[in-house]
């Protein structure tokens, strides 16, 4: 069996329920890629003896043994090489269980906002998973829940290993930074079907690849032995544990239940930014101070005139903080 082919997918379930689902998907051959290229489906039991102990590939068993969730991450799709994990879960949303995750060792066309495309090498944790929501008003906020779960997962794994915490920060709306350099990002897309929003969440996190910026282990390698460095599988398992807890709080109590922790983790409290406001035919620039988030997920800021404003990106800049447009509340 050639599991190194670019269109090979390996299915692995946490329990007999997910294992039966994997077998059914393989037998029915229903998983497809957006370009309709041929897909080879394998079960984890078929390939486990072909993976070497020193293999740098994602360790499926290590991840699955770390999972203690009830819904998320219990059904795994893994591939050594994919164009996009996000495309796999979004294109097959109706075929796979809600909460399924797709992981790839190498990703050539990872999806970013405004159709940006990212190439991700080995050592980067690249995954996409699915969830369902009914209230469209809070769907835009799910990216903040995901961002927070990633930072808290890294913190938990560091604590368990006795390591000093890598201080990963959130740059609004969906980037992750370490020591001033971008090490990750989140993308959420959704479609509406049968009165539900079908949300596909994509995450990329530099764990063990120092290019193109830096990574989590680059900060740790000088202070701990290689055997104690962070592993992608451990971080992903910790992420789903955190996310499931945060998601339940979010759905029951709203984002207010997570705001305090989120604001301790993001980079922007008290940040002064330039916002633009159209005044008849002129564009006026004003300096405002970021206070937090509005109920719709945009930036809440206060002007020097003590008036509260909601800040929106203009959509024309790669940096969200260039070209902010303000709207009086």
Curated annotation (Swiss-Prot):
GO terms for cellular component: cytoplasm. It is found in: Cytoplasm. Keywords: Cytoplasm, Ligase. Biotin binds at residues 84-85, 107, 111-113, 182. Highly expressed in seeds. Expressed in roots, leaves, stems, flowers and siliques. GO terms for molecular function: biotin--[biotin carboxyl-carrier protein] ligase activity. InterPro entries: aa-tRNA-synth_II/BPL/LPL, Biotin_CoA_COase_ligase, BPL_C, BPL_LPL_catalytic. Pfam families: BPL_C, BPL_LplA_LipB. It is an enzyme of class 6 (ligase). Disruption phenotype: No visible phenotype under normal growth conditions. It comes from the Eukaryota. The keyword Ligase applies. Its EC number is 6.3.4.-. CDD domains: BPL. Residues 67-251 form the BPL/LPL catalytic domain. GO terms for biological process: protein modification process. Its main location: cytoplasm. Belongs to the biotin--protein ligase family. Seems to have no or limited implication in biotin-dependent carboxylase biotinylation in planta. This is Biotin--protein ligase 2. It comes from Arabidopsis thaliana.
């Amino acid at each position: 069996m050639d599991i190194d082919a670019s269109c090979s997918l390996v299915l692995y379930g946490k329990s007999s329920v997910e294992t039966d689902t994997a077998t059914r998907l393989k037998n029915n051959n229903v998983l497809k890629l957006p370009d309709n290229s041929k897909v080879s489906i394998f079960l984890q039991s078929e390939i486990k003896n072909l993976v070497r102990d020193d293999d740098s590939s994602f360790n499926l068993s290590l991840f699955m043994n770390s999972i203690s969730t009830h819904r998320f991450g219990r059904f795994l799709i893994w591939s050594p090489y994919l164009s996009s994990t996000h495309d796999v879960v979004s294109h097959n949303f109706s075929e796979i269980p809600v909460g399924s995750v797709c992981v790839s060792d190498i990703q050539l066309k990872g999806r970013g906002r405004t159709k940006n495309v990212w190439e991700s090498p080995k050592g980067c944790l690249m995954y996409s998973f699915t969830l369902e929501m009914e209230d469209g008003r809070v769907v835009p906020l799910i990216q903040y829940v995901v961002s927070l779960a990633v930072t808290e997962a890294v913190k938990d794994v560091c604590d368990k290993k006795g390591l000093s915490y890598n201080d990963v920060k959130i740059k609004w709306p969906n980037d992750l930074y370490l020591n001033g350099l971008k090490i990750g990002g989140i993308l959420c897309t959704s479609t509406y079907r049968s009165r539900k929003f079908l949300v596909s969440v994509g995450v990329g996190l530099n764990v063990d690849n120092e290019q193109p910026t830096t990574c989590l282990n680059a900060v740790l390698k000088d202070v701990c032995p290689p055997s104690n460095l962070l592993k992608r599988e451990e971080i992903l398992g910790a992420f789903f544990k955190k996310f499931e807890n945060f998601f339940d709080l979010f759905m029951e109590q709203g984002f207010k239940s997570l705001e305090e922790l989120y604001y301790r983790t993001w980079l922007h409290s008290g940040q002064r930014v330039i916002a633009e406001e159209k005044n008849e035919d002129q564009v006026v620039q004003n300096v405002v101070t970021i206070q937090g988030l509005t109920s719709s997920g945009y930036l809440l800021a206060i002007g020097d005139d003590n008036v509260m404003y909601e800040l929106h990106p203009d959509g024309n800049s790669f940096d969200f903080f260039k070209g902010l447009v303000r709207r009086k509340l």
